[in-house]
A protein has these predicted regions:
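Short alpha-helical donor nucleotide-sugar binding micro-motif in glycosyltransferases
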Residues: 346-351
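Nucleotide-activated donor-binding/catalytic signature segment of Leloir-type glycosyltransferases, i.e.
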Residues: 305-312, 318-345
Length: 458
């Protein structure tokens, strides 16, 4: 792979400036609807990365770009989403990859879904959608969707590759989040996720080296969803000399917008006259989402303000919500797992405050959705969360892993803040920073740069 160093970047900028003023039409101009983008993601709908990839596809199509999405798990009849097909083969890839992880964990379920090997996957280079695309845009491609060999074939095809990082996996050996480990900077090894903390030449080291070899086979542009993840990624020896920039995920502000709170509660059969604290997660028992800190914060808040037992409740959106009943000091209203966007919007609009005490996170879609609906958010000062929540302006940023400060923030939003000002500021920030057009224009700059570099190389 030919890395993009500063000299090359300057050359590309000159080339782009020349094209901007040269009086002829080229096939990668920002306003040229012939640009074709293929976004590759494991699932169409399941998980935050799938939601973000779908929203980016819609944002690009609404901006005049022809964008399609290639997925393993197709769940709708959307004609802009294409399935890999061969369902039995795809399931085999998933099962084999999971078995290999399980084997290397000595058949322990600890960290089973915190590790990916990319040792099996599908060759997509023969698909018509791949051949038609000007740019291949990788999103979250783990759990048997693409192998490292698949990625190598994509790079060897000569097509420019843009890769949106929803976590650290593309820049590390095998982990999605480093949990304070920085061994990924220089080759991994002695991985804390492996039994006995691995060895100097363990699985994490071997996969890191394989990635290093694969990444040399073509040109890639990495995009992170948060500035925090960009800083983490730039530390990796895998991405040394490769372009890494930060562009947030988009959101459709015509769907996620403020609605009448009482009407939303009626539709969801939630109490109309209680203050509602909302907690959302695909799997609410996921330790990374900080449920233990949430439970502790609620206990502390209710102990200090016992009147909240009568006027406040907790709505929980996500799987396994029923497991939390009896563990919280306030009444719990499980909503379950919901995929319909309008119903999710109603859930946010029913809430008075949204709490996400994640211990490590990128740029959570859930905070963006809540803010778009005018709901102030409370979260820890971790990952990309402080980039979204402006402390005491549109929400509250609590000290990391501090249940007392989390409790203080929730109570402040509910009882001490200028709630209307917080709500309006939350909506305003989303419209300024995360609208479809704003994000699409930033990605068009990356696509144009990638295509200009390809043409310059020719």
């Amino acid at each position: 792979m030919i890395h993009i160093n500063s000299l090359c970047a300057q050359t590309i900028n000159i080339w782009l400036l020349f094209l901007a003023f040269y009086p002829f039409s080229c096939n990668f101009a920002a306003n040229d609807i012939s640009m074709r983008i293929l976004i590759v993601n494991t699932s169409e709908k399941t998980g935050g990365a799938a939601v973000a990839a779908n929203r980016l596809k819609d944002a690009l199509n609404n901006s005049g770009v022809k964008a399609k999405m290639l997925v393993r798990d197709k769940l709708t009849d959307d004609i802009t989403v294409v399935s890999l097909g061969h369902e039995w083969r795809n399931q085999w890839h998933l099962l084999w990859e999971r078995f290999c992880v399980f084997w290397n964990l000595h058949f322990s379920r600890n960290h089973l879904f915190e590790i990916d090997l990319a040792n099996t996957g599908t060759d997509i280079t023969k698909l018509r959608e791949f051949k038609e695309a000007d740019i291949i845009h990788l999103s979250w491609i783990n759990q048997g969707m693409l192998s490292l060999n698949s990625i190598k074939k994509i790079l060897c095809s000569g097509k420019p590759v843009v890769w949106t990082m929803h976590d650290l996996w593309p820049a590390s050996g095998i982990c999605h989040y480093a949990h304070g480990c920085y061994r990924y900077e220089n080759g991994c090894g002695n991985c804390p996720l492996l039994p006995g903390r691995g060895s100097s030449n363990d699985l994490s080291s071997k996969v890191w080296k394989r990635k290093k070899a694969v990444y040399h086979h073509g040109n890639m542009w990495f995009v992170t969803c948060s500035q925090w993840l960009a800083r983490q990624a730039k530390r990796s020896g895998l991405l040394r000399g490769i372009s890494v920039r930060s562009i947030p995920n988009p959101i459709d502000t015509h769907i996620f917008e403020p609605q009448d709170k009482q009407k939303a509660r009626q539709q969801l059969q939630l109490p109309e006259y209680k203050r509602l604290i909302l907690f959302v997660s695909q799997r609410v028992t996921d330790q990374r989402k900080g449920m233990d800190y949430f439970i502790d914060a609620i206990d502390k808040m209710v102990a200090e303000h016992p009147e909240m037992k009568d006027n406040t409740g907790i709505a929980i959106l996500g799987g396994h919500a029923e497991e939390l009943e009896g563990k919280l000091a306030l009444p719990v209203y499980p909503i379950g797992y919901v995929t319909d966007q309008q119903r999710i919007r109603d859930v946010y609009n029913a809430a008075n405050v949204f709490v996400l005490p994640s211990l490590e996170d990128n740029l959570p879609n859930t905070i963006m959705e809540a803010m778009a609906c005018g709901v102030p958010c409370v979260g820890f000062k971790v990952g990309g969360i402080p980039e979204m929540i402006d402390h005491c302006k549109n929400g509250y940023v609590a000290a990391e892993r501090n249940a007392d400060d989390l409790a203080k923030g929730i109570h402040w939003v509910l009882d001490e803040s200028d709630y209307t000002a917080l709500s309006e500021a939350a909506v305003g920030k989303v419209q300024r920073c995360y609208s479809q057009r704003s994000v699409a224009m930033q990605y068009l700059e990356v696509y144009n740069e990638a295509l200009a570099y390809k043409n310059f190389r020719l």
